[in-house]
């Protein structure tokens, strides 16, 4: 089983991602974090293989705060893959920063919020 932790600002979006992953491959065991403050512990407890986090311009979901969580998770679980989700239409500058984080090797992948559930699942499957 591949364990995936999903930490999204929008609970409906988190549910959609979890459902898409489960429907794509029954090998995915998906856990949803209730809040960013609980994400690191959830990743450690579940021994997550992949952490998917939404990045927005709002507190607790800002890129800087997400990178802190990334650092905490990687310190305890270096093999955990980090994937950031960003809305490239409403957050153009933030989307550029997320893309640069990937280029700089700080994250394993990023996904734009406008992609299909099937594509998201396929990308996660390749990690």
Which residues make up each language-model segment?
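Extreme N-terminal starter segment of soluble prokaryotic enzymes
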Residues: 1-4
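Conserved acidic carboxylate
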Residues: 7-8
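Short, aromatic/basic amphipathic alpha-helical patches
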Residues: 17-21, 68-72, 93-103
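Acidic, metal-coordinating helix/loop segments flanking the phosphotransfer/catalytic sites
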Residues: 34-50, 58-60
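Two-component signal transduction core modules
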Residues: 51, 82, 109-110
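Conserved phosphotransfer microenvironments
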Residues: 51-77, 86-89, 97
